[in-house]
Design a protein with these regions (language model features):
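Short, glycine/charged-enriched secondary-structure capping and boundary segments
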Residues: 18, 71-74, 127
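A cytosolic small-molecule/anion-sensing beta-strand core signal
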Residues: 5, 25-26, 116
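Catalytic metal-binding/acid-base residues of hydrolase active sites
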Residues: 10, 62, 117-118
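Short gly/ser/thr-rich secondary-structure transition/capping motifs
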Residues: 12, 91-94
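Histidine-rich, glycine-flanked metal-binding segment
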Residues: 9, 13-53
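Active-site loop-helix segments enriched in His/Asp/Glu that coordinate
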Residues: 96-127
Length: 127
């Protein structure tokens, strides 16, 4: 169980809480309120007034398919030799060690749909 206190909470539904608390148990939010007493054995985190929002969903990206260190050799999201490339699959080229994943997490992205680029008429299958 985790209690986050002193957070600027911006929920999807309901009023903004400039100095609120959020209680989560087993990975699920169980309470959001201006004040919540910490249950026994609960881990308490002081957010220090930081913004707390629901996780962001990235609906179209190429995260894990573009290795910036390799320049064009690492761009696995576009195959521009043909206009139709339905055989391309993100799962075949995704790099789970891509440094963009931790950057996205730090930015609040919790879900991402990654796949081939949009340079082709039919570009392939997203993961």
């Amino acid at each position: 169980m985790i209690l986050i206190q002193n957070a600027h909470i911006m929920p999807i539904v309901g009023p903004e809480l400039p100095n609120g608390c959020l209680l989560a148990e087993d990975g699920r939010i169980t309470a959001v309120a201006p004040h919540i007493d910490a249950p026994e054995g609960c881990t308490v985190i002081d957010a220090g007034g930081r913004l707390l929002t629901p996780g962001c969903v990235e609906a179209h990206c190429h995260i894990g398919l573009d290795n910036e260190c390799l320049r064009w050799e690492g761009m696995d999201y576009n195959e521009i030799v043909e206009p139709l490339t339905p055989q391309l699959r993100a799962i075949d080229s995704i790099n789970p060690q891509d440094g963009a994943f931790p950057n996205a997490l730090r930015g609040g992205v919790t879900t991402a749909c990654t796949g081939p680029g949009s340079a082709n008429v039919v570009g392939g299958t997203f993961t």
